Amino acid sequence: GYEKPDFITINRFRNRVKDEINDIFTQIVLLLCARGFVSLDVEYVDGTKIESKANKYTFVWRKTVERNRAKLLEKIKALLEQVDEAIAQDKCNVDERMEFTPTQLSEMSAELNTALSSLSVTTDKKEKERRKKLQKTAKELEKHSKKLSEYNQHLDTLGERNSYSKTDKDATFMRMKEDAMNNGQTKPGYNLQIGTEGQFITDFALFPNPTDTLTYIPFMESFKNRYEALPSTEIADSGYGSEENYRFLEEHGIEAFVKYNRFHIEQRPRYVQDPFRSENFYYNEKEDYCVCPMGQHMNRIGQRRVKTESGYISERHRYQAQNCNGCPLRPLCFKATGNRIIERNQICLYSAAIY
């Protein structure tokens, strides 16, 4: 008696019935809604980082895997050039860049070993050296096959993430809010997003992405999947302020109280508005031009599209000054050659003006 289940047993139980636990949570919130404790029309969103118990030195980085995998493919290509011409031509064209699979490499190695074993015994010294070299090539092909399989497995585990921990493959390396050393060290963890109303948690979700900005829309969609509707009012801090999120809220008719990302910086007592920042330039909406601190008109010269990490396309209008030569404010304004060019994101500037 008095035996306690260890953490592995508890974790296995949670993994086995996680769908049922999620359904029970939803039913409890719906019961609170039926009793009038929450309305599900208002949601306060915030996030926090939860550190994993995984070892912080068990990281796997996407860039490292992709770089080493590319080097390995080059080694394989060079190695195949040494293989018997008939086998090389049968399996691949070494003059063309192609993707090899671990299975292909294992088959090449096996075929090469079979071809070597079928040869008759020879006493020719040069022929012996050639066969010995081919045997070595076959072993290296098999070795490269295993390594390529390992890299492919890393990429499959990574998915769309940039890192993961070997001892907790669901954890992603990210900077935590509590940084005792103050050196920005990344640790394995999770980005937990929580929605509340009336001090009750109404929704939650874990994300591998450390940036709150990129988790907001998926979190809103999880709310809709759970309750078959979106809240009519959203409240969130400046970590969620982005053009993509503002557009999402506007398109779905949601009343938003989401601060733009520079809101808290501008509220500091010592904050002084920089007149040379492009967003502080006077803008004539009717005639579509900006005015620099020197009073010179900056006419629109086109627009540029920027693709964000989430795939969202942001359009930015570009404006150029007519003549910056000899301007006494130029050293404070910009350091590039030619006339200054600025970009304006109309949606973000509109949101900043509201708040």
Where in the sequence are the language-model features?
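Anion-binding and metal-coordination hotspots
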Residues: 3-355
